[in-house]
Amino acid sequence: MQTNDPVFAGWDGSVIQARQLQRQLARRVVLDDAVSATPQLLAGFDVGFEDDGQTTRAAAVLLDAQTLLPLETHIARVPTSMPYVPGLLSFRELPALLQALALLSRTPDLVFIDGQGIAHPRKLGIAAHFGVVTGLPCIGIAKQRLAGSFAEPGPERGDHTPILLGGSQIGWALRSKPRCNPLIVSPGHRVSMQGALDWTLRTLRAYRLPEPTRLADRLASRRGEVTVPAGYSGHLL
């Protein structure tokens, strides 16, 4: 579990110190909205694995914020540096995600990451860690709860309930599609609690996942390719 990545400078590779670092970085998370009402670029990120887990495969998709059409797709591959440890996903996946970010030709105004934001036992899921490291506004979109509790949201698309941990809200349980389990939506960095919900709703189409992470999930999991429209460079870009 040793790593030489500068993102984890000072980490000795132990689980105990990783959790301590999470608590320190969580204090740097900003939960105020820093996203324009009319952003131009969104990005979605997700991670998969190859070679029996020996290679981490990070997918990045850049989208037009107005049309939600993809503008760029990229894959970054790095050697997997540590095994899966519950609650420490970012220490396993962040190096590949940062390499995928570096492949984008333009900087996104808002990032969606498949994983937790602050809906995490130490309030530093991968979307929060990514946001603190990069300074980019981030939202975490997870398929399962990692921390806290919530009342089941109503059955209709858009129904939502707060996720609470120790009396404080850490995210939302959002019914993004009827007859599907709710998504776990939480701010990662430089996005408010309400902003995380609003932006997720704005980027939903006919599927359970919002478009940024849905497209990234297709690339990362190899379930399908993402086609960039020929000659399309973005709405008013």
UniProtKB/Swiss-Prot annotation:
Coiled-coil residue spans: none
**Binding-site list for Mg(2+):** 46, 114
- Say which enzyme class the record assigns: hydrolase
Keyword hit for Disulfide bond: no
**Presence of the UniProt keyword Thylakoid in the record:** no
Site feature location: Interaction with target DNA: 84
- In terms of superkingdom, the source organism counts as Bacteria
Which Pfam family, any one, appears in the UniProt record?
A: Endonuclease_5
Swiss-Prot/TrEMBL catalytic activity: Endonucleolytic cleavage at apurinic or apyrimidinic sites to products with a 5'-phosphate
The UniProt keyword set, sorted, is: Cytoplasm, DNA damage, DNA repair, Endonuclease, Hydrolase, Magnesium, Metal-binding, Nuclease
Q: Which InterPro entries match?
A: Endonuclease-V
User: What GO biological process, any one, is recorded here?
Assistant: DNA repair
List the Gene Ontology MF annotations in alphabetical order: deoxyribonuclease V activity; magnesium ion binding; RNA endonuclease activity, producing 5'-phosphomonoesters; single-stranded RNA binding
Instruction: Please list the cofactors this protein needs.
Output: Mg(2+)
The cellular location(s) given in this protein's UniProt record come to:
Cytoplasm
Q: What is its EC number?
A: 3.1.21.7
Which Cys-Cys disulfides exist here? Answer: none
Name one cellular component (GO) term. Answer: cytoplasm
What task does this protein carry out? Answer: DNA repair enzyme involved in the repair of deaminated bases. Selectively cleaves double-stranded DNA at the second phosphodiester bond 3' to a deoxyinosine leaving behind the intact lesion on the nicked DNA.
* Similarity comment: Belongs to the endonuclease V family.
Q: What is this protein called?
A: Endonuclease V
Encoding gene, per UniProt annotation? nfi
